C-alpha cells in the first residue's frame, strides 16, 4: 500500500518536471527560430536597402501583391 502511494507521487513529480522541460525546450526553439529569422533578413543585395523586420513569428503581416497591368 505504501509502495503504491510512493510510486504515484513519483510519477506525478516526473510528469510535472517533464512538462516543464517541454515548455523550456519550446521557448528555446522559438527563440532560435526568431534569431535565425532576424539574421536572414539582413540587407537586400539588389538595392542595398535593409529589409523590413518582422515583429515575431506569430505576428507576421504580408502586403498584397500589386495588380498585374492590363495589356
UniProtKB/Swiss-Prot annotation:
InterPro entries: Polyoma_agno (IPR002643). The modification Phosphothreonine is found at residue 21. GO terms for molecular function: channel activity; DNA binding. The keyword Transmembrane helix applies. It is found in: Host cytoplasm; Host nucleus membrane; Host rough endoplasmic reticulum membrane; Host cell membrane. The keyword Transport applies. Keywords: Host cell membrane, Host cytoplasm, Host endoplasmic reticulum, Host membrane, Host nucleus, Host-virus interaction, Ion channel, Ion transport, Membrane, Phosphoprotein, Signal-anchor, Transmembrane, Transmembrane helix, Transport, Viral ion channel. Residues 45-71 are extracellular. It is a single-pass type II membrane protein. Residues 1-27 are cytoplasmic. The chain crosses the membrane at residues 28-44. GO terms for biological process: monoatomic ion transmembrane transport. Changing residue 11 to A: Partial loss of phosphorylation, defective in encapsidation of viral DNA. Homooligomer. Interacts with VP1. Interacts with large T antigen; this interaction may impact upon the activity of T-antigen on the control of viral gene transcription and replication. Interacts with small t antigen. Interacts with host PP2A subunits for dephosphorylation. Interacts (via N-terminus) with host YBX1; this interaction modulates transcriptional activity genomic promoters. Interacts (via N-terminus) with host TP53. Interacts with host FEZ1; this interaction disrupts the association between FEZ1 and microtubules. Alters the structure of the nuclear envelope by interacting with host CBX5 and disrupting CBX5 association with LBR. Involved in the perinuclear-nuclear localization of the capsid protein VP1 during virion assembly and maturation. Plays an important role in the release of progeny virions from infected cells and in viral propagation, probably by acting as a viral ionic channel in the host plasma membrane. Allows influx of extracellular calcium ions in the host cell. May contribute to viral genome transcription and translation of viral late proteins. This is Agnoprotein.
Amino acid at each position: 500500500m505504501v509502495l503504491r502511494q510512493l510510486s504515484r507521487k513519483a510519477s506525478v513529480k516526473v510528469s510535472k518536471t517533464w512538462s516543464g522541460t517541454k515548455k523550456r525546450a519550446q521557448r528555446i526553439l522559438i527563440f532560435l527560430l526568431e534569431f535565425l529569422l532576424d539574421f536572414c533578413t539582413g540587407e537586400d543585395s539588389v538595392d542595398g536597402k535593409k529589409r523590413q523586420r518582422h515583429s515575431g513569428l506569430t505576428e507576421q503581416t504580408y502586403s498584397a501583391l500589386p495588380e498585374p497591368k492590363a495589356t
